[in-house]
Design a protein with these regions (language model features):
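Metal-dependent phosphohydrolase cores
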Residues: 1-61
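Surface-exposed, charge/polar-rich loops and edge strands
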Residues: 62-64, 75-78, 83, 129, ...
Length: 253
């Protein structure tokens, strides 16, 4: 079988000349090339290298698309008026109070929101009034989350992501996600099928892989939910089985 090789030269590439694919034995130098050609390789090796490069470029493109969606959604959230925000938050609380997951839960985990995110102060008030214990996440070196109880002694620090996180020491008991009754997952954008774009760290994607759907939900403004998924979805991305907006339960288990 004839060896098929790509004859590639930096000068050729910089001048946007065509890449040569040939079935002929290659001399030490190819015509039009100013430097020695690369070693002859089988077509299979070339295909594998091309596939690897294409995969890397495609994955980078997908990440760029998600980052663009994040930036667009942040602008939309920042443009919401305080009045509209509060009105939607109050309606979401009313919907949440009727959910069996909420009614049954004795422990509830939530993440301290940033300014443009869905605010949870009303949720915290409702949880404390109902006698529920609130937990907040702590980031770990392996980019997963563990949870600690939020009580009157809890103090917070701001992480590199700008999120408030509890300050802990060796005396704080740590809980895994599977130990908690209900986990309210933050996010920037959702589809009506439960797809989610978070903030890019992947912490919840890793942490919730083995948590059953019934105990996972998100709270969102209506502008955060779209019927169409126009962003890349990876196998490692978690789905949100229950999403609640001011208009009701978008998707339920």
């Amino acid at each position: 079988e004839w060896a098929k090789v790509w004859a590639i030269d930096h000068e050729m590439l910089s001048n946007e000349l065509p890449i040569i694919l040939t079935d002929e034995p290659i001399m030490e130098k190819a015509p039009l090339l100013s430097s020695p050609i690369l070693e002859e390789r089988s077509m299979r090796a070339v295909e594998l290298e091309f596939l690897k490069l294409f995969t890397e470029l495609f994955e980078a493109y997908q990440k760029d698309v998600k980052n663009l969606k994040r930036a667009q959604q942040k602008r939309e959230l920042e443009a919401m008026t305080p009045g509209k925000r509060r009105a939607e938050e109050k309606r979401v609380v009313e919907w949440l109070k009727g959910m069996p997951q909420w009614i049954e839960a004795k422990t509830v985990a939530l993440t301290m929101p940033m300014r443009m995110e869905f605010q949870l102060d009303l949720i915290v008030q409702e949880a404390r009034s109902a006698g529920k214990t609130i937990f907040v996440p702590v980031t770990m070196p392996d980019k997963t989350l563990v949870f600690v109880e939020w009580n009157e002694q809890t103090t917070f620090k701001r992480t590199s992501y700008g999120v408030l996180e509890p300050v802990i020491d060796s005396t704080h008991p740590l809980f895994e996600a599977k130990d908690l009754d209900l986990i309210i997952v933050p996010g920037l954008l959702y589809s009506t099928k439960g797809d989610r774009i978070g903030f890019g760290g992947g912490y919840y994607d890793r942490t919730l892989q083995k948590v059953d759907d019934y105990r996972i939900l998100s709270l969102a403004y209506t502008t955060q939910v779209t019927p169409a998924v126009d962003w890349p979805v990876f196998e490692t991305d978690i789905h949100i089985p229950t999403i609640i907006t001011s208009e009701g339960v978008v998707r339920d288990v």
